[in-house]
């Protein structure tokens, strides 16, 4: 047994403090010099010391022996051989006789899955030998070669064929002393007990095993990195193999041939060199880790081997590895000047010496180094969201993904999930558990729940992707909890981005093309929509965005892609995200006397891309105000005790993750119901009932399908029923807020008023109680706006029908008669018909004044005023009757 195991936990002895037996002085390895022949140490007769040939004195080179490192290697090798996990994934204990060692199983799996990395749980290492664990953490960079040597020895022992296959035949036949590359196999440690932020990294962490967390903002392409180089001397063609590359291109210092003095002329033999995958990612501090008033800091992380392409832009990841100092390429030299070291030959002691100028001459060192992180392990940062690391999941694998998710849960979690699925009224209970700090707004909570569930992504035979994600916009008065919903969703989902519309540009939302400071190449830096891929992008103050910036997200909202053609880069990037937007009405408060389109600063294409619009009004209601005030006061007084939802956040995350594995489909009844509801929406829109929201298009039909699928997922069923379609229809109708209009005053024209005045005069027989002013006043009638629009639409429909038949004008009598026939089902008594005729006459007069219709004058005698029934009316040539009938708006 190694000295490490015999020392146990006695870490108080120096070197030495890890409990290792060592012959070092201090903590430095000893240098053992082998005995030399006396003749080899003698000087030549001429007194000059000649250079010894490298090959001839191979045994005479001083050899450094790190006894502490050897002890670590032996102890780590014993750990890999001896450690056995007491419990398997299912939680059942296995007999020790039938259980194979934990890491020996991993070594056997290397050849099976053709991987090169063994993953070591730091908790296992601590429980087995805490002294060894402490030594590896504090001096990982020093002990890393010894740990890899121990791993290679075990791979050679248990999987000799796979170990030999890692060597190229050329290298194996090149030299009998050729050994396996240290870069071929790798170790990855995880589950370290402590995590650091980017801001905590200092130079004292260099070389120590550390876990850092951050959000990935940029990833480079995977490139080959030279791990072990084989060089050929250009002068004598001697081959030098196994030249380790230490963070830069490293050539041999001198040719080993005793007859060759070459030190610079080398040619790399690519076929006999070993390469490994290399990738650089840039991470940024998480938003909750940035101190007040500070800018977020970034750090470059180097990934090698099997862990490349594990971190995507927008992922919150935990990286385990070591902090290293590398040259800062961007600071090494001035453009056009080759950076090189030279000696200042000026004679400052002479008579012609100039004064000392500049900080460099005063001894200030150049800052030409920066910190980077060399990672050996990449994991999702699920420290705060234990069950919500991938809440949304794409649901593309169906049953297989469902089984895989259930296998990742414990038995207790599975029982709890089963109870939730089989409970009654789960849809409404899930809604009430969302955003418990926000009082009321059940309709908005339903929409957010369905957005988290999402619809089913589809692919047409032509290869066109049909999105399943839902886009929601919340419009309302100030202080109606719009931003609270956005914050809640960002905290609920691990892959959610919060941004503000006023502070966001088009490039910041989509993607930007930036120039890499090291290579000089143009690369794509992800924007908010790319970072929220497979998540939700919450955009607050959406109405404050410039219209040019709103146009930039048209493609992302519908096609869920971002196309870029800049700086020689043509790319189409994925932005499979849902957008949750919040907007304030124009003027601060929602005006119920105008349409939704006129209340918000959005273009029609943007509005049609939102599946749901929720309008929140701050109305005075004594009961609602009392309950709302009590809820807010309880939160300030009792904190978390005031919010007691039925389901916790972890339960909601598990349920949503499980529900997204379902792929519900439409049946015959639900298809017929969707067609029926869509026809009803279009009919209401054509008749003016939907004028207060936006035009109903085919996108609203697709929205109804996506909402129905999301409701089916919320109920964990595979079939969409007509009841789900009706619920989706009712949600879609929520955005159609009734527009309050002032009553319309209609009156008779001057001739009709004069006739009525004469009749009144003859009737009163000179009654002195009626003043002359009242007699001259024209009679006015107030009708509701909806009634006015209904009569106007009926009149215009009759005129347009006659116009298509070739009739230029319609007499008023025929026009009124045709209108009454069109609406005959609305009249029950003769008094209703007489009253309606009077209203139609007054509306005709107003339509003439508003230049919607015009009266055709009598060509024979224009001075003679015809009776009302004989007057001829036609559509005014300046009136756009199609637009007027589509939205129902009339000039004021």
Swiss-Prot record:
It is an enzyme of class 3 (hydrolase). Residues 759-769 have a biased composition (Low complexity). The modification Phosphoserine is found at residues 96, 98. GO terms for cellular component: chromatin; cytosol; DNA replication preinitiation complex; MCM complex; MCM core complex; nuclear pre-replicative complex; nuclear replication fork; nucleus. Keywords: ATP-binding, Cell cycle, DNA replication, DNA-binding, Helicase, Hydrolase, Nucleotide-binding, Nucleus, Phosphoprotein. CDD domains: MCM6 (cd17757). It catalyses: ATP + H2O = ADP + phosphate + H(+). A motif (Arginine finger) lies at residues 608-611. ATP binds at residues 476-483. Component of the mcm2-7 complex. The complex forms a toroidal hexameric ring with the proposed subunit order mcm2-mcm6-mcm4-mcm7-mcm3-mcm5. The heterodimers of mcm4/mcm6 and mcm3/mcm5 interact with mcm2 and mcm7. Interacts with sld3. Belongs to the MCM family. This is DNA replication licensing factor mcm6. It comes from Schizosaccharomyces pombe (strain 972 / ATCC 24843).
């Amino acid at each position: 047994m190694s000295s490490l195991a015999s020392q146990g936990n006695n870490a108080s002895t120096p070197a030495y403090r890890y409990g290792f037996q060592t012959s070092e002085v201090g903590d430095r390895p000893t240098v053992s010099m082998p005995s030399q022949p006396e003749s080899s140490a003698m000087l030549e007769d001429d007194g000059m010391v000649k250079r010894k040939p490298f090959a001839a004195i191979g045994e005479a080179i001083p050899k450094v022996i790190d006894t502490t490192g050897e002890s670590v290697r032996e102890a780590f090798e014993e750990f890999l051989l001896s450690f056995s996990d007491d419990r398997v994934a299912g939680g059942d204990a296995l007999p020790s006789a039938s259980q194979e060692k934990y890491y020996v199983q991993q070594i056997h799996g290397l050849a099976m899955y053709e991987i090169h990395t063994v993953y070591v749980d730091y908790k296992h290492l601590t429980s087995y030998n805490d002294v060894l664990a402490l030594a590896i953490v504090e001096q990982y960079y020093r002990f890393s070669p010894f740990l890899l040597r121990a791993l290679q020895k075990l791979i050679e022992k248990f999987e000799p064929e796979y170990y030999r296959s890692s060597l190229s035949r050329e290298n194996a036949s090149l030299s009998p002393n050729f050994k396996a590359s240290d870069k071929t196999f790798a170790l990855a440690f995880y589950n370290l007990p402590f995590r650091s932020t980017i801001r905590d990294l200092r130079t004292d962490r260099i070389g120590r095993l550390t876990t850092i967390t951050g959000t990935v903002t940029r990833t480079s392409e995977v490139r080959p990195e030279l791990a072990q180089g084989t060089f050929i001397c250009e002068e004598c063609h001697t081959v030098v193999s196994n030249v380790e590359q230490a963070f830069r291109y490293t050539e041999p210092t001198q040719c080993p041939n005793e007859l060759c003095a070459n030190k610079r002329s080398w040619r790399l033999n690519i076929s006999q060199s070993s390469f490994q995958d290399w990738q650089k990612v840039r991470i940024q501090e998480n938003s909750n880790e940035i101190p007040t008033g500070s800018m977020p800091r970034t750090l470059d992380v180097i990934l090698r081997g099997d862990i490349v392409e594990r971190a995507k832009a927008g992922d919150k990841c935990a990286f385990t590895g070591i902090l290293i100092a590398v040259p800062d390429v961007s600071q090494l030299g001035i453009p056009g000047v080759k950076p090189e070291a030279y000696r200042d030959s000026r004679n400052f002691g002479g008579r012609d010496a100039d004064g000392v100028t500049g900080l460099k001459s005063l001894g200030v060192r150049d800052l030409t180094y920066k910190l980077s992180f060399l990672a050996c392990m990449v994991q999702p940062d699920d420290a705060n969201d234990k069950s919500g690391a991938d809440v949304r999941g794409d649901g593309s694998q169906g049953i297989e993904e469902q089984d895989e998710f259930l296998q990742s849960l414990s038995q207790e979690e599975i029982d709890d999930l089963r109870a939730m699925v089989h409970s009654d009224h789960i849809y409404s209970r899930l809604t009430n558990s969302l955003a418990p700090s926000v009082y009321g707004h059940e309709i908005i909570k339903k929409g957010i729940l369905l957005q988290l569930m999402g619809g089913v992504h589809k692919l047409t035979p032509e290869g066109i992707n049909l999105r399943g994600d839902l886009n929601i916009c919340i419009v309302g008065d100030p202080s109606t909890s719009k931003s609270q919903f956005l914050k809640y969703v960002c905290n609920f989902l691990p892959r959610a981005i919060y941004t503000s519309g006023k502070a966001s540009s088009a490039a910041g939302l989509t993607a930007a093309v930036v120039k890499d400071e090291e290579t000089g190449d143009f690369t794509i830096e992800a924007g908010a929509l790319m970072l929220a891929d497979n998540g939700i992008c919450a955009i607050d103050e959406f109405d404050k965005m410039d219209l040019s910036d709103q146009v930039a997200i048209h493609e992302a909202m519908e096609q869920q892609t971002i196309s870029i053609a800049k700086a020689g880069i043509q790319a189409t990037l994925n932005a499979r995200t849902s957008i949750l937007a919040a907007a304030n009405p124009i003027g601060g408060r929602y005006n119920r006397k105008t349409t939704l389109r006129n209340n918000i600063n959005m273009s029609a294409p943007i509005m049609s891309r939102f599946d749901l619009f929720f309008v929140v009004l701050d109305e005075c209601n004594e009961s609602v105000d009392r309950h709302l005030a009590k809820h807010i006061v309880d939160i300030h007084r009792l904190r978390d005790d005031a919010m007691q939802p039925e389901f916790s956040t972890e339960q909601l995350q598990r349920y949503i993750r499980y529900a997204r594995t379902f792929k519900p489909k439409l049946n015959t009844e639900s298809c017929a119901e969707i067609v029926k509801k869509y026809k009803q929406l279009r009919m209401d829109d054509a008749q003016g009932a939907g004028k207060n929201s936006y035009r109903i298009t085919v996108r609203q039909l697709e929205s109804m399908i996506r909402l129905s699928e999301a409701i089916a997922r919320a109920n964990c069923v595979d079939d969409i029923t007509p009841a789900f379609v009706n619920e989706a229809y009712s949600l879609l109708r929520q955005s159609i807020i009734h527009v309050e209009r002032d009553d319309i005053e209609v009156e008779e024209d001057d001739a009709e008023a004069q006739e009525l005045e004469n009749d009144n005069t003859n009737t009163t027989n000179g009654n002195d109680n009626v003043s002359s002013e009242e007699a001259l006043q024209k009679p006015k009638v107030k009708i509701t706006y909806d009634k006015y629009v209904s009569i106007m639409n009926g009149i215009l429909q009759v005129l347009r029908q006659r116009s298509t038949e070739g009739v230029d004008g319609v007499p008023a009598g025929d026009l009124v008669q045709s209108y009454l026939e069109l609406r005959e089902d609305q009249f029950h008594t003769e008094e209703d018909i007489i009253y309606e005729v009077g209203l139609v006459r007054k509306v005709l007069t107003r339509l003439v004044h508003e230049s919607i219709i015009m009266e055709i004058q009598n060509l024979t005698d224009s001075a003679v005023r015809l009776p009302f029934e004989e007057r001829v009316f036609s559509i005014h040539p300046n009136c756009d009757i199609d637009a007027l009938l589509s939205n129902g708006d009339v000039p004021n």
